[in-house]
UniProtKB/Swiss-Prot annotation:
Its cofactor is Mn(2+). It comes from the Bacteria. Keywords: Hydrolase, Manganese. InterPro entries: Adenine_deam, Adenine_deam_C, Amidohydro-rel, Metal-dep_hydrolase_composite, Metal_Hydrolase. The lineage of its organism: Bacteria, Pseudomonadati, Pseudomonadota, Alphaproteobacteria, Hyphomicrobiales. The gene is ade2. GO terms for molecular function: adenine deaminase activity. Belongs to the metallo-dependent hydrolases superfamily. Adenine deaminase family. This is Adenine deaminase 2.
Amino acid sequence: MNATARQEPADLNDPALRARAVTAARGDAPFDMLITGGRLLDTVTGLIRQADIGLVGALISSVHAPASRTDAVEIIDAAGSILTPGLIDTHMHIESSMVTPAEYASAVLPRGVTTIVWDPHEFGNVHGLDGVRWAIEAARSLPLRMILLAPSCVPSAPGLELAGADFDASMITEMLHSSAVGGVAEVMNMRGVIDGDPRMTDIVNAGLAAGKLVCGHARGLEGADLNAFMASGITSDHELTSGADLLAKLSAGLTIELRGSHDHLLQEFVEVLSGLGHLPPTVTLCTDDVFPDELQEGGGLDDVVRRLVRYGMKPEWAIRAATFNAAQRLKRSDLGLVATGRRADIVLFEDLTEFRARLVISGGRIVARNGSMQVAVQQIDTAPLVNSVKLPPLTENDFRIPAKGERVRVATIDRPRFTQWGEAETEVRDGFIVPPAGSAMISVAHRHGKTDGIPRIGFLTGWGEWRGAFCTTVSHDSHNLTVFGGNAGDMALAANAVISAGGGMAVAKDGRIEAMLPLPLSGLVTDASLKDTALAFAGIRKAMEKIVTWKPPYLVFKACFGATLACNVGPHQTDQGIADVVTGKVLENPVLAVW
């Protein structure tokens, strides 16, 4: 982890650069670039005013009265544009977009996103430290500023699941030694922190000792549990469940990473914040997870800003949360504000409703114009990410549970979110359990080569009637081979299609593959273009509608990718069985009684 990224923010304090900026600001030398005729949104006051901006290298040398200076090597006509700082995404996972970091950068920079805080824990869960090293190397030469975080919970629920790696505090410390790593990523093992588990305590303390961020995942925490979680040194949360939860977390003193991936809650969040009469300085914005078709169609953090404004948030509040507040959270005073002496990350938006970027400047360079990249984006070798699915072909019987007797009582997992334990009775036919009426099957097979790859099968209630099967290696957070279905035949067919592809997603119905998305890199991403990936993923979505009827907001396609997230409260299927983080126990086989 000795590799370092660009040495920011200290690069702005180069004496020669500062001297040039001072000289240009006095009017004794021309600017490198002069932006004229635009209206500047001040992210401190929220006011909009006419102003011209002079740049010297990566530095803003002058913010001055319109048309008072005309001397510059390059002049940008910003007439009709609103100027803001570059947008900052405070919590996200590139892997959720299923494309490489280079392709992701090419997608969001033209939309005005100049900085992301990337938790590469998907790569970490599959490849261990080598995956994080690859992410650092991939980010190094990209024009999109990527502040990486050290994945804190690999796996997310130790003892309840097996990932491709197991990070302890010494590994976190190694990652934190890299200047490219800005802190410890979302601490999802909430119970471990609250109960003083030595592993999690040491991981949090590693971040504190490094003087870097320690980020949280405080879903459902309140009262003594929330206090214990925060007392450890964790300072942020993006796992909000309601407007009341948002207000409670703000009052508690957490930095909020308001995420766009739960759109059904955004309206309520806007109403709560509007009721305060001001935007708290601890409200930032993030995307968390954006699927490829959503990224292609709507964008990244710009889409979150756009939706918040559509739901009634003041545009200046949304921009402030996405820029100034975010920069303060990251301890990056050079970002988030278009002001003299700060870094020249500037976006020229057409308006403050649709937020279409006409021009994007990052570090004093024009990186995108009218939706197109203006600088090269370097893709590094992806060979280290292949061959991550270590499983043989599976058979129909691998997706059946054998049992003696005539009837059985089985444990079930009830509801797609906020899961609960349930029970059901069903019959045994030809030596195998018949899935209980109204249930769907879920199977998780370890695919990282650390233990056997035998599928562990459970029964889901509240998931509707499945008329086929869906297999995915994108399955948070250990990303084992996960299959949902209504019959063993289609489940085996979908699973083998994904295994043959080296990872990805497949939908099967009536003995045929309806749709396929190969993800041969880590079983998570592809080196195909975003356009092609989005098209294939949209095909998966469409095929899914043939085999299951969704019922928003909880029974939705996205629920398939979080059904194995064992760090969340309640029962969840893993490669070890049905796991419960509260009790710390795993039920390897769902059969409770036979008669």
